[in-house]
Structures are given as C-alpha cells and as structure tokens.
Design a protein with these regions (language model features):
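SAM cofactor-binding core of SAM-dependent methyltransferases
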Residues: 1-35, 40-42, 77-80, 85
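Structural motif
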Residues: 42-44, 72
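Switch II (G3) loop of P-loop NTPases
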Residues: 46-49
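C-terminal substrate-binding/active-site "lid" region of AdoMet-derived donor-dependent transferases
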Residues: 53-172
Length: 172
C-alpha cells in the first residue's frame, strides 16, 4: 500500500494485491469473485498496467460500487509510446490501461468519465451519463486503439480535465 495507505482515514478500506502484504493478498479477480456483496464508496484501480486486466477490474468494481461511489484508474495518460507498452521497457511505465478508458468511452453511456491531467492520468468514473465517443466524428479514425491516433486525440479520448476543473467539479 505504500505511503498513502496510512493517510486514508475511512471506516472501511481494503487493499488487494497478490505480491504485497495487504488486507487481501490475492489477485483482483479472486477478490471480486470471493467478495460479491461488499460495496465501496471509492475504488482505486492500479494493478497490472495492462488493458484487459484494467478493463476487467473497472467492470468488476462497478458491481461493488455504492450508488454515489467513484472509481479511479491510475496511469491512464501515458507520456510516450514506450511508456504505454503492455510490457515494461523503460523507467516510465503506464502500460496500455488508457485503452480501458477508451473502451468505456466508446461503449458505456451509463458512466460519467473524466481524466484528471495529473500523475500520469487519473481517470474518474461514476454512474451517470456520457455521450459516447464517435470514432469518425470525434477523432476522425477507426483505429482508436493505435497509440499515434491516441496521441493526437488524447484530450478528447480521455475527456481530460485540469486539476482546478477537478476541484471545482468534485470537491466543491
């Protein structure tokens, strides 16, 4: 859990990690399978840094989210092509989790999704409504999962907001 864990002051907090000694030393898939009825106000997704697992964690998190809850996925705004590769090849590494946000922006109109332009991208999701991305109209491409297309359209794809916009929208 690292530095931030002790600073989180809530009645219920769980950490899930198969490698780190935390509340639940298991994979997120195992956790979601075994703890079906547990609900949370806030779920932080920062796991394997690969698209498929991040997407699965977000979908599973939705089933464990209280009605007014929020999910945050970390590392969704990679700074370079090498940083977004699914296998770590450099010091800076996000993996391709940005694709999970893209998929949700393309397919799930019942989520409100924004990405705060901070700390390699923090994407916030909560139940609500969003206008789905239209590949041809919004980014003029069918190949949205290509990094170069993402690079040129990241603000639109991630629905990027600034830290001050985040504070105004979520903290006021």
């Amino acid at each position: 859990p690292g530095y931030n864990w002790p600073q989180i002051k809530v009645d219920l907090k769980h950490g899930v990690d198969p490698e780190v000694d935390t509340t639940f030393k298991m994979t997120s898939d195992e956790f979601f399978e075994k703890h079906i009825s547990q609900k949370y106000d806030f779920i932080f997704v920062d796991g394997l840094h690969v698209f498929e697992q991040c997407y699965r964690d977000i979908v599973n998190s939705l089933n464990h989210l209280n009605d007014n809850g929020t999910i945050m996925a970390h590392d969704t705004n990679p700074s370079s092509e090498i940083a977004q590769r699914p296998v770590r090849e450099s010091d800076s590494w996000n993996g391709d989790v940005w694709k999970a946000i893209l998929k949700l922006r393309l397919e799930n109109e019942n989520l409100e999704i924004v990405t705060v332009d901070t700390d390699e991208g923090c994407s916030l999701m909560r139940r609500g409504k969003q206008k789905l991305l239209n590949p041809k109209a919004d980014v003029n491409s069918e190949d949205l999962y290509n990094y170069e297309v993402f690079q040129h359209n990241r603000r639109k794809i991630l629905n990027m907001i600034s830290v001050s916009e985040f504070k105004e929208k979520f903290l006021s």
